[in-house]
Amino acid sequence: MLYLVGLGLADETDITVKGLEVVKRAERVYLEAYTSILLVSKEKLEAFYGRPVIEADRELVETGSDEILAGADKADVAFLVVGDPFGATTHTDLVLRAREMGIESKVIPNASIMSGIGCTGLQLYNFGQTVSMVFFTENWKPTSYYDRVKENVQLGLHTLVLLDIKVKEQSYENMARGRRIFEPPRYMTVAQCASQMLETEEERKEGVFGPDSLAVGAARVGGPDQKLVVGTLKELSEVDMGPPLHSLVLLGRKAHDLERLYIREFAVDKATFDASWNKGYGATS
C-alpha cells in the first residue's frame, strides 16, 4: 500500500502516532522535498525514525513515480509530505497513478499552513481563497493572483498568501545546455511578497490594496521561534522576519474586533496600526 503521511509544520516530532507507525514498518520511506520544507534536516528525521529516508525531488515525483510505487502492491511504501499530504496537486497525481496500477493508497493527515495560520488569531472561517505569490523576474510578473484577492476583498475576507520557494531549480542557460547544475535554494520573504503586491497594485490600479492595507506576516509557523508581525504592506515590505518559511495574510475589511485585539500586540507600530484600522476595518454585520 502507498501511504501519504503528513509531517506537520515544524520538526520531526510533529508527525502523528499513526504516521510514525507507518514510517517504522514501511519497506521504503520517501520525503517529498520541493513543495515545502521542514524546519529540521533530513538527518534529524532519520535519527528520530531510526531508519533511512529517501529524498524525493520534483523530477522523481513528477516523472519517476513508477520508481516510488515499485512494489507497493506487495509491501508498504511511505511518502512523507510537509504539512498535509494534499497540500499540492502533485500528491493527488501520485495517488491517481497508484490507482491506475492497482495499488491501494491511504492518507494520514496532519496540520498544514492552511490550518496553522490560525496562530495569527484571525478566525479561519473569515478567510477567502488562498493565493500563491511567485518570485517576479525582469520579464515575468504574473498578476493572476490579484483577481482572486479582489474577490476576497469585495467580500471583506482575509487572504492567505503562500510564498514561493525555489529548490533544485535550474537557470535558463543550464537548462538550455542540458547541464544538471542547480541554483541555490531560494525562499520568498514577507518583505518581498509585500513589495511585489504593491508593485502589482501600481500596475493594475484597481484599488484592491495599497501601502496602508493591513497584513500579518508569519514566519516558521509551528516552530519554537515562530514569529508574527502586523503592519501595513508598506511596513511589511521593510521588515526582516528571519529564516524561512514565511506566509502573509492580507486582512479583510470585515475583521472582527477580537481579531484586532489579538493581532495589535504584534504591530510594527501600534499608532500606525490603529490609524489604518480606523480607515475602514471592522465587522459591519
Swiss-Prot record:
S-adenosyl-L-methionine binds at residues 9, 84, 87, 112-113, 163, 221, 246. Signal peptide: none annotated. Belongs to the diphthine synthase family. Coiled coil: none annotated. GO terms for cellular component: cytoplasm. Pathway: Protein modification; peptidyl-diphthamide biosynthesis. It is found in: Cytoplasm. One of its GO terms (biological process) is methylation. The gene is dph5. InterPro entries: 4pyrrol_Mease, 4pyrrol_Methylase_sf, 4pyrrole_Mease_sub1, 4pyrrole_Mease_sub2, Dphthn_synthase. Transmembrane segments: none annotated. Pfam families: TP_methylase (PF00590). This is Diphthine methyl ester synthase. GO terms for molecular function: diphthine methyl ester synthase activity. Keywords: Cytoplasm, Methyltransferase, S-adenosyl-L-methionine, Transferase. Its EC number is 2.1.1.314. It catalyses: 2-[(3S)-amino-3-carboxypropyl]-L-histidyl-[translation elongation factor 2] + 4 S-adenosyl-L-methionine = diphthine methyl ester-[translation elongation factor 2] + 4 S-adenosyl-L-homocysteine + 3 H(+).
